[in-house]
Amino acid sequence: MTATEATASPAVQQAAAKAGRERFASRLGFILISAGCAIGLGNVWRFPYITGQYGGAAFVLLYLLFLVILGLPVMVMEFAVGRASQKSSALAFDTLQPSRRWHWFSWWGFIGCLILMMFYTTVGGWMLSYVVKMGTGAFNGLDAAGSAEVFGAMLANPGELIGWMLAVCVIGFLVCSMGLQKGVERITKVMMTCLLLVMVVLVVRSLTLPGAQAGIEFYLIPDFGKLFAGETVSEQWATFGNAVYAAMGQAFFTLSLGISAMEVFGSYIGKDRSLTGEAVRICGLDTGVALLAGLIIFPACFAFGVNPGEGPSLVFVTLPIVFNQMPLGQLWGALFFLFMSFAALSTIIAVFENLISFVMDKWGLDRKTAVVRMAVTVVVLSLPCALGYNVLSGVSIPAIGDIQSIEDFIVSNNMLPLGSLLYLVFCISRKGWGWEKFLAEADAGQGLKFPAWSLPWLKWGIPALIIVIFVMGYAPKVALWLGLA
């Protein structure tokens, strides 16, 4: 079997050309947009915290291991499916394997992206809101209680949350309406460049604060003892198990794999570069942003004696107080939330493009019509989350939480791991696309090749890890539901 036969057939390629499939204008655009999709809020409010908790650089090494053996292969598979088919997930599986009933899987990614946007647009709106709040001095003179009150007041105001959610949707869909090259690629390249520049400025400011050294040591100096913290041997191994699970989860979830978020970008590129090399660059950029976020947060928190927590409370309650204590704190705080806004919007624009491409391929719509229909759909579906902190605050599920937590649980604990498993089966199984065809597509072009010797690991190792992630995500919740915890 030749490389040409093993990838997309000439008929598929000719059909794509006749259909006028849009293309990225540059390789840099593809890398930055794919990285922008991966770089999200978890890079800021989760990765730095668990890195410090489990031994700094010791945990980073563990994380990088799982990024390479778990996240990277699945990312290459998503890119390969997109590039070989020259279609979004709406038609990719039928194009590559028309004799099997893989077409139902196309809806998995579409629904997953929709649910992701149901809460991500609201949280992205928080970032825009805080750029304004920090810039106008809303936190001046406030202590931790006052900062928490500002955050609570925002959540309790449905009009404010809906307004900022609408602003995020308008920005995202407006960019997508301008087209792939003139809109999505051009704007995202500018936004990602600004994100990196703002991060560098904030890192320099944070590292030069008096007392920042303690935060740097906590974050980066390897402490393998923290990987085995505990009084007894069983406690020590339990800590190590938690660290391994945290590393696996972070490596897996940070890339948003399994809902075809990356697949569509593969359909916009040619075959001049191998996909493994491109995926390595994207993962490296995503990891770099996460590491830089820690260099902003920990030195600043330690410099002012503030305990760095995890999650939204770190970003929306703790950090405004830290910025308050800095000279020119309003400026640094506004820049930080501008960086956070760019991180959120880069993901939102990328996923919006995925949704738009899906309906364009599925129903033959032009871009403008697809944008309007998806904009209305996303806004309507985002309302429950925006109202979930106030009008619908009584809606919750035990062990999961409010509406936003429920939506996040559906995507993160279910659709991402199971979707990744399905991509894996499709790419290596004879009943799917097949290993030889996938490998030929992944290796087409110059650059790093996908290791052919890794097939046994793909067959047995990755499925086992994905099942562990899936089960571990449910274990504490099931224990609570059964009254065992």
Place the predicted regions along the sequence by residue:
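Hydrophobic alpha-helical segments of multi-pass membrane transport proteins
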Residues: 344-350, 371-389, 405-440
